[in-house]
Amino acid sequence: GVKAEGIKILVEKIKQYEKDVFVVAPMYEQSASSHRLTLRRGMNCERIDDIIDGVPTYALDGTPADCVLFALRELDINFDIVFSGINKGYNLGDDIIYSGTFAAAQEALMRDKKAIAMSCKYNSFEGTKYFDEVYKYIKENDLLNERVVLNVNFPANAKGIKITHQAKSTYKTYYIKKEDNLYYTMCDTTTPLNDEPNGDIQAIKNGYISISPLGIN
């Protein structure tokens, strides 16, 4: 949600490079919300305390994709680029399809805006120390445009940067019925990860920052 540590870290990093920064983020965590829009109920939007001084911050009772569209259409923020994240946990392979973090960036791309989605190792933002190096690399190599989302994943300690593609990763998913008579979704994280050459999963496994340029089609 809007008070997540990863958002604050990202804003602090962005402020070094961009003059006008705004935050529009979900009120609550939106893990695996994918590209869902809120259609069958109303949404509440609140201007809250700046996440850091001088950065107008809005909390929307919606999904990450909602936030991008709401910022553009209702708040009338004519942004040039969307930074989404920093997600607490890698978004690699099939995870990207389910990711609300990536969906926000993809929504921006659909509106002809530049977009970067960023993720780190679960429960560790140590990899954000490479933000400056990565952003410089992106700018110097002219990777940022309105045709692709840059999906960036930071390991805690990196050997370098690799341009990658989205690999295939299928987790064993099953369901457990508990005492409350409800079913809970479980994923077997011990499933071997795909090691295909130049894939995002392989890059992270080998200790590299992964940058995957991903188009809508």
Predicted feature descriptions by range:
Residues 11-78:
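A cross-family phosphate/adenosyl-ligand binding-site feature
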Residues 109-128:
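Glycine-rich phosphate/pyrophosphate-binding loops
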Residues 90-99:
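Glycine/threonine-rich flexible loop motifs
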Residues 1-8, 194:
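Short acidic, Gly/Ser-rich segments with clustered Asp/Glu that frequently serve as metal-coordination loops
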Residues 24-26, 84-87, 118-119, 152-153, ...:
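Short beta-strand segments
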Residues 29, 63-64, 87-90, 216:
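Short glycine-rich anion-binding loops that position phosphate/pyrophosphate groups of nucleotides
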Residues 81:
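Short, Asp-centered acidic motifs that coordinate Mg2+ and/or phosphate
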Residues 128-217:
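Electrostatically charged, flexible surface regions
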